[in-house]
A protein has these predicted regions:
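Short juxtamembrane and helix-loop transition motifs at transmembrane-helix boundaries
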Residues: 79, 97-105, 122-132, 188-194, ...
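Membrane-cytosol interface segments of multi-pass membrane proteins
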Residues: 1-174, 276, 288, 309-364
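Aromatic-anchored segments of alpha-helical transmembrane domains
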Residues: 17-25, 103, 126-129, 167-183, ...
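Membrane-interfacial entry segments at the cytosolic side of transmembrane helices
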Residues: 159-166, 226-236
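Alpha-helical transmembrane segments of multi-pass integral membrane proteins
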Residues: 103, 209, 237-347
Length: 364
């Protein structure tokens, strides 16, 4: 049994919750921000859970690679056109958020000098060439590049042995990680530094993405599931592995291990038995994951920091941020979904996309 569409969506739901947890509480300078309820020495316990959440991007990359490879196998001929439409839908979603949070809310709060600020910054953000305003938007450019290069990655994975693919991807990841963290290569030309940065971000994101493609192509999850089902205390085993990873990452506090933790967590999470109500919760967050990714930083850091941290205690702060983001997500979708329907009608009428192959779906 391979990963289903619902399982991938649930995984994205967990990933976005990890992202919020990471950005809220992965700091030891908590005084004035929140009141920890449990301490381990001088460090809040919530810090270690938040640190574990740094695998969120790797999880999303894995899901994207897995999903796109599945789409590639189903419709190789129309794959590139589907990808272009997928990217355009993401742009459409992003532009609505850009208008609401940068062009409207920024000036209303008296922050016009920075939101939107200069025309150059706005255009570079609008095109996703070099997004400003929101630190979480860096992944927008990287994701678009991953989607655009996915046909070539898919072909390579079908052609070459997985050990060769993993070796090349691993070396690329290692070099890109050093550049991203240490900034070894710095040049005088702005556009070259931008290019180097994008290559580094792409390089640190492509490893879990490639592993996701490999999982789909070689059906590794099915093989893992066969082994897992033979275990007597399956859930206890899986939860124990997750706890050990949280402890291990608390000892080895480096972003370098994030892809390996993320990939392992995805496998265990989907193998675990979960009650139906819990699956529905994760599916719900999976559907809103794109909006939550693109807007959450406006609340906890840029515009409404004091409001978000007002509840003081981590569980209340976390819940409050989720509520604020979900309300905003519904507002965004109020505009986004009708535009998708208009676009769906236009593309089928003017471009002749087949209804079955090119039916538009929300980017969630």
């Amino acid at each position: 049994m391979e990963l289903t569409k619902n399982q991938v969506s649930m995984t994205k739901g967990v990933a976005i919750l990890f992202m919020l947890l990471l950005h809220l509480f992965c700091t030891k300078n908590y005084i004035g921000l929140f009141q920890p309820t449990v301490m381990i020495g001088d460090t809040p316990l919530i810090y270690y859970f938040a640190l574990f959440g740094d695998c969120c991007v790797a999880m999303y990359c894995f899901c994207s690679g897995y999903g796109l490879m599945s789409s590639y196998d189903k419709d190789t001929v129309g794959y590139k056109k589907n990808n272009l439409m997928r990217i355009f839908k993401l742009y459409l979603n992003f532009w609505i958020i850009l208008i609401v949070f940068v062009l409207i809310i920024g000036p209303l709060l008296g922050m016009r000098n920075h939101y939107p600020g200069s025309f150059k910054a706005f255009i570079l953000t609008l095109t996703a060439i070099d997004p400003a305003y929101n630190g979480a938007w860096w992944f927008l450019t990287t994701y678009i590049l991953l989607v655009l290069t996915s046909p070539y990655l898919n072909k390579s994975i079908k052609k070459y042995h997985p050990i060769i693919i993993l070796g090349i991807s691993g070396i690329f990841y290692f070099i890109a990680y050093i550049q991203r963290i240490k900034g070894v290569l710095q040049l005088d030309l702005e556009w070259l530094n931008w290019l180097i940065r994008q290559v580094a971000l792409y390089g640190t994101s492509q490893l879990p993405y490639v592993v996701g493609i490999l999982f789909c192509h070689y059906k590794w999850y099915s093989k893992l599931n066969v082994f897992y089902q033979k275990l007597r205390f399956r859930n206890a085993f899986g939860i124990s592995i997750i706890i050990l990873m949280v402890i291990g990452h608390g000892i080895v506090q480096t972003l370098f291990v994030a892809p390996f933790i993320g990939i392992t967590f995805i496998c265990i999470f989907n193998l675990l038995y979960k009650p139906l109500w819990l699956e529905k919760v994760f599916l719900y967050f999976g559907k809103h994951s794109t909006n939550l990714w693109l807007i959450h930083m406006f609340f906890y850091m840029i515009y409404f920091k004091e409001l978000v941290f007002a509840p003081k205690y981590p569980i209340l702060i976390f819940t409050w941020l989720i509520i604020l983001c979900l309300i905003s997500s519904y507002v965004i979708n109020f505009f986004y979904h009708p535009l998708l329907r208009i676009l769906d009608h236009f593309t089928k009428k003017r471009i002749g996309f087949e209804n079955k192959s090119y039916k538009l779906e929300s980017v969630e």
